[in-house]
């Protein structure tokens, strides 16, 4: 994370002077799992606001029909969708409407309206990666049951002037951790929880 070209590439993509780490995640899908990752965008899951990108890395080779699909251009829709859980039958947190001053909608039913969208998918080998805007809708497009365990790793990175902006109650657990470390609504994504990964000299 700290000693790789990753944040410099993020800075180029976001036209940023500085890149801070927002969070990293490790995803595991068990062999035989029939549950698809729901279509969602990461921006509404947590109390973060600003220009951010996600680095997505497969930890084993993946064919495009088995992997994640991205809805082309969805980062430009200027819409916020409610958080959809990956478990619990893809339960949606909250109700559509105005929450903390922002309008949230139900995520469109991508799977039932595939012809309405253009999708981006790739065959990937170990060592390949994808960067995408944190507002981009993505999820599982094809009902493929993995024969082996599937592992993915992601990094979320933020451009300077990104902020902590409180969203719905669904983010309260992560919010409590931030508040326990001295952060509050409106603070910059910087400091000990969000270290600087890259800064132009």
Could you describe each region identified by the protein language model?
Residues 40-41, 105-116, 147, 168-173:
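Short, surface-exposed loop/helix-turn segments at secondary-structure junctions
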Residues 40, 47-64, 123-126, 131, ...:
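Short, conserved beta-strand element in jelly-roll/cupin
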Residues 30, 63, 77, 138, ...:
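Feature marks short, surface-exposed loop/turn motifs that line or immediately flank catalytic pockets
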Residues 16-38:
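Long, hydrophobic, well-ordered secondary-structure blocks that form the structural core
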Residues 3-7, 32-43, 52:
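Short acidic (Asp/Glu) patches
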Residues 64-137:
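Double-stranded beta-helix
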Residues 1-24, 47-50, 92:
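Signature of the catalytic double-stranded beta-helix
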Residues 85-88, 126-131, 135-201:
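Non-heme Fe(II)/2-oxoglutarate
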């Amino acid at each position: 994370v700290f000693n790789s070209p990753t944040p410099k590439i993020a800075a180029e993509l976001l036209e940023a002077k500085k890149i801070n780490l927002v969070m990293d995640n490790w995803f595991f899908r068990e062999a035989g799992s029939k549950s698809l990752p729901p279509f969602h965008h990461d921006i509404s899951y947590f109390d973060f606001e600003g220009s951010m990108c996600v680095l997505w890395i497969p930890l084993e080779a993946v064919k495009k029909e088995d992997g994640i699909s991205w809805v082309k251009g969805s980062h430009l829709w200027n819409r916020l969708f409610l958080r959809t859980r990956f478990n619990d039958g893809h339960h949606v947190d909250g109700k559509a409407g105005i929450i903390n001053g922002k309008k949230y909608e139900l995520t469109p039913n991508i799977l039932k309206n595939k012809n309405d969208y253009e999708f981006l998918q790739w065959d990937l080998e170990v060592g390949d990666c994808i960067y995408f805007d944190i507002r981009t809708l993505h999820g599982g497009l094809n009902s493929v049951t993995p024969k082996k365990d599937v592992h993915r790793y992601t990094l979320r990175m933020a451009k300077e002037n990104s902020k902590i902006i409180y969203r719905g109650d669904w983010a309260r657990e992560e919010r409590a951790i931030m508040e326990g470390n001295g952060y509050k609504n409106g603070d910059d994504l910087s400091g000990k929880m969000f270290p600087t990964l890259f800064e132009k000299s």
